Amino acid sequence: MVDFILNAQVRSDLGKGASRRLRRNAGLVPAVVYGGDKEPQSVTLELREIAKLLENEAAFSHVIALNVGGAKETVLIKALQRHPAKGFVMHADFLRVVADHKLTAHVPLHFINEEVAVGVKQSGGEISHTISEVEVSCLPKDLPEFIEVDMAKVELGQIVHLSDLKAPKGVELVQLAHGNDLAVANIHASRVVKEEGSEEGAAE
């Protein structure tokens, strides 16, 4: 399902110098579209348009309708090059999406029930996130906007791993499939509790 739309124009003026001129004089961003059974294509996007799109976190894990000079492509954002100081997009890579071919994409994690987690509410612990996104493999129609991490039953000292997550039907966690059951989050003793314990020990 396509929820986002971007407009682009075919780019014939290539090279680093041309890219700098585009950004400086026209407010345009150079980009490349690749994948599928077509040749890579160089395009330009309006900086304002892609900046507005990226304000929505879901754009990074959604299929995008890219209109290239009247022709339509369905794509995913695969890479962004940003200005090191100002943060604006300097270059973008888009991967063509084929409906019946599995794709890989990075999907954000949404942590829920952190305030009522057993290790927080009953033991005064603090939650640490080890990763904020996961790489998934699925058909385009099954690509989730995010994956939830329910912290409600997590106790003090407990670690949540990829194997504890509930991936939607048809979605495979790439690292887990390769035997890497990565840590996602944990609940540890808060610094305040640790410091109080140290002070009490010193007093004794």
UniProtKB/Swiss-Prot annotation:
<dbReference type="Pfam" id="PF01386">
    <property type="entry name" value="Ribosomal_L25p"/>
</dbReference>
<dbReference type="GO" id="GO:0006412">
    <property type="term" value="P:translation"/>
</dbReference>
<dbReference type="InterPro" id="IPR001021">
    <property type="entry name" value="Ribosomal_bL25_long"/>
</dbReference>
<comment type="similarity">
    <text>Belongs to the bacterial ribosomal protein bL25 family. CTC subfamily.</text>
</comment>
<comment type="subunit">
    <text>Part of the 50S ribosomal subunit; part of the 5S rRNA/L5/L18/L25 subcomplex. Contacts the 5S rRNA. Binds to the 5S rRNA independently of L5 and L18.</text>
</comment>
<dbReference type="GO" id="GO:0022625">
    <property type="term" value="C:cytosolic large ribosomal subunit"/>
</dbReference>
<dbReference type="GO" id="GO:0003735">
    <property type="term" value="F:structural constituent of ribosome"/>
</dbReference>
<keyword id="KW-0699">rRNA-binding</keyword>
<feature type="modified residue" description="Phosphoserine">
    <location>
        <position position="123"/>
    </location>
</feature>
<protein>
    <recommendedName>
        <fullName>Large ribosomal subunit protein bL25</fullName>
    </recommendedName>
</protein>
<keyword id="KW-0687">Ribonucleoprotein</keyword>
<keyword id="KW-0694">RNA-binding</keyword>
<comment type="function">
    <text>This is one of the proteins that binds to the 5S RNA in the ribosome where it forms part of the central protuberance.</text>
</comment>
<dbReference type="InterPro" id="IPR020930">
    <property type="entry name" value="Ribosomal_uL5_bac-type"/>
</dbReference>
<keyword id="KW-0689">Ribosomal protein</keyword>
<dbReference type="InterPro" id="IPR020056">
    <property type="entry name" value="Rbsml_bL25/Gln-tRNA_synth_N"/>
</dbReference>
<dbReference type="Pfam" id="PF14693">
    <property type="entry name" value="Ribosomal_TL5_C"/>
</dbReference>
<dbReference type="InterPro" id="IPR020057">
    <property type="entry name" value="Ribosomal_bL25_b-dom"/>
</dbReference>
<dbReference type="InterPro" id="IPR029751">
    <property type="entry name" value="Ribosomal_L25_dom"/>
</dbReference>
<dbReference type="InterPro" id="IPR011035">
    <property type="entry name" value="Ribosomal_bL25/Gln-tRNA_synth"/>
</dbReference>
<keyword id="KW-0597">Phosphoprotein</keyword>
<dbReference type="GO" id="GO:0008097">
    <property type="term" value="F:5S rRNA binding"/>
</dbReference>
<dbReference type="InterPro" id="IPR037121">
    <property type="entry name" value="Ribosomal_bL25_C"/>
</dbReference>
